[in-house]
Amino acid sequence: MSSSANSSPATTKFKFTDNLWDGFDLLVKRTDNDLIQSKNILNFFKKKAELEEQHSKKLEKLSLKTMMTIDESTSINAISYNSSWKKIINSSMMESEQHTLLNTSILNKVIQPLQAMIKDMETKRKKILQEGIKLKQDMKEMVDELKKSQFKYDKAGKDLESSRMELREYREQLDHQQQQQPSDSDLNNISKIERRIQRCEQDFSNCDEEYREQIKATNDFQHLYNTEKLPKILNDFEHFVISHSHFSKSYFTNLVSVLIELPSAYQQNYEFVKKSVEMIDITNDVQEFIRKNLMKKQLAQPFQYEPYIEGKLTKKTISLTWNNKILSQFSRSSNNNTATANNTSSGNLNPYLNGGIGGTKKDEPILPTASFKVSLDELMNRQKDNHPTLEVPYVLQVLSTRIAQMKGHVTEGIFRVPGIISTIKETRLRIDKADFNLSNIDDVRTPAALLKQWLRDIPTALIPDSLYQQCIDTPTNAIAIVKTIPIINQRVLCYLINFLQIFTKFEFVAHSKMGTSNLAMVFAPCILRCTSTDANVMLNNVPNERLFVETLIKQIPPPLNTNEFLNLPISMSDAINDSEDIEELNDLDQLSNDDNNNSNTNTSNISIGSGSNSNIVVNYSNNSPNIESSTLPSQSVVTTIETLPPLNDDHNSGSGNESNSSSSNSTTTPTGSPTTASKPRGPRTQTLGWVRIKPAPKPSAEPTITLSSSIAAGTTTTTTTATGITTTTTTTAGPEKTIISPVIIKPAAATPTTTTPTTTPTTTTSPTTATIPAVSTSTIKTSSPDRTTPLTSSPPLASTKSTDELMKKLDQFTQETTPSIRIATTTTPTTITTPTTTATTTTITTDKTTPVTSSPPTASNISSEDLMKKLDQFINF
């Protein structure tokens, strides 16, 4: 009997399902270690086969090369010696063949089967692992649901008990007051409490039913967990371990057979290896593994229904006043925050609820793959394998890249406007689980908020606490302070500042409204952490913290190994939503924007013609006038017309007054007074770093006006229509003239034209083109609902002027660099087209003769030949 008792423990066969019940994690490590060991064995045999092949080739090459040196034809060689030497070389050739055969055998009988086994085992292990993790998760969810239902049940019981206590105490107070008949208010209060008790009883009944159903569902799943699910997974692990050992042993046996098949010279060397392989005992190895990790199989007890027992709540004094009732309700709600373990009679629901499968803790542990609340050194060490060349934490690059992809640099209020809290928490949890795919995020505020959270959650601030006071005392010395912080902190801080410098570009700030100061204010708490808990100190340090970060943004240089956008998906075109609605402003626009404040190009086309073959077009593009010339009929009287830049709605009062006064003065200038020309503004040479969106054009109705009048010479006539068209005309000496009857003004499409500036005078013998002087005395204004475009004409040459004055005037025109236009008065209808800044043109058509000037001047002391030469010179110019 004693012998059998002593032998029984040794003959007991262990099983995973009985002796490793809670060994899921242990088996995961064991199977992973088996696969790693098999991969090491595979690499060893691969290297051995490679060396055998190399040795075979080298030995064969050496033997052939040596054999070629033997010369049998000569008579001076010893025959027996040469014969023996040739046999030695041939034996080396045979040895080379044996190495080749060994290499082939190892490849076919060991390496290839072992490689296939590893691949198959990895697939099986992955499937078992997924099933086990899912089973554990399902069990955890069931226990969590049971925990919630029990909490609701206990809470409903507390509410019911509290209401009953309130009613009982209320009635006791009425009895103490010895009132013969309760008042209406007392009866009303009692009725309210009774109705509340009814609701609480109904809620308690529903929660009780839900609690019982959840207990049944959890017990059913736990039974399935204990009898089928978990035993199957443990059996799969056991089969995996045994199969792995069995296959490995068979491949070792194949190797031994290959070695034994070698010639007898090698056989003795591998006899010991053969014996050691034969001694492998898989069953004993498995039993020894279980014996070393014995676990007691202890199944969890079924969940029991635990009824709520009254008497947990302490007696409270309830006053008849409503204020005390409200305070008592707050007191009761605060008492509801007690531990869940006290909600049941036993005080303990299940081992799972206290750190078991479904256990939850107040302070969640940091995941092994977490990126938040982890030191910079640990993050850098963790990413050495996957991102060896990255000098900053990978999470920082992922968040900044996603912000750039979602155009955060042109998003208004970026980093300042908060995101959706639930989305931020969900995304943060995904990142902590090493899921850095943020492509499904549709709100740029989410990665922006996570970037700030990541900076705030670093255990040690980017600027160490020991340097905080120095940063507050000397915020302008930020660069020198940054040089003293750790290297990894410097890299992260420089990357962050270079990233923020992108947002400070004028083009992006125009959209985001987040300049250097705003960004510094937002990121100061992320970079600096106040060491004091005094609210006054923290508040007083805010300006210096902001100044410190602002100094960093302004003084830290851009990186050398990347572009200005850190190789992020950012370009300057992101600031332009529509090329037609965006303009650049240059420094000249800042100095003199009275004439053009909302457009980068001002295009005005003026067509004044006599019939279909006489036309002059002036195109203003980029404030540089380009003139297209056409034919004017001969014997035309010449006058001048200048197109003034359109008035803008957003002018200040000063500029508007200046423009109005100039127009008013031009209409009252005497006919004989000389005119002076001002140079147009030159081409833009430098653009500012920001843009402005032009206002959308407003639709304008087609205005129609008919004017018919006779005016005397030397008078000024101003006519304004209901549609906002103002016509001002100054007449010269001469008979009365009938003007503009009828006049039709209609919008026309504007076609910008670019031509070469030319200036040509008008003669009486050939068609010419003329120029536009800079000053005029007669103005025609066309007003649309949103723009006013003045059209100004200068006075004609007076008949009283001498030829000398005319020659001086031509010399002056020759020296001027400003192109101008002279328009001949004809007896055919005249068309004037002036596009406004709203991309429409206004056409004025006159059907009657519109004389503008008096008779041509007469020569006084110069011949016609000299005059023609001067005109030719002017034409050539």
From Swiss-Prot:
Region described as Disordered: 589-612, 644-704, 749-800
Residues of the Rho-GAP domain: 374-560
Domain F-BAR: 14-285
Molecular function terms from GO: GTPase activator activity
Bias-annotated ranges (Polar residues): 780-800
Low complexity biased stretches: 593-612, 653-676, 749-779
Subcellular location as annotated: Cytoplasm; Contractile vacuole
Site residues (Arginine finger), renumbered to this chain: R416
Effect of gene knockout: Show a subtle phototaxis defect. mgp1-/mgp2-cells have a severe fruiting defect, an overabundance of filopodia and slug motility and function are affected. They empty their contractile vacuoles less efficiently than normal and consequently they have three times the usual number.
Main location: cytoplasm
Listed PANTHER family: FI04035P (PTHR45876), GTPASE ACTIVATING PROTEIN HOMOLOG 2 (PTHR45876:SF7)
Name of the protein in question: GTPase activating protein homolog 2
Organism: Dictyostelium discoideum
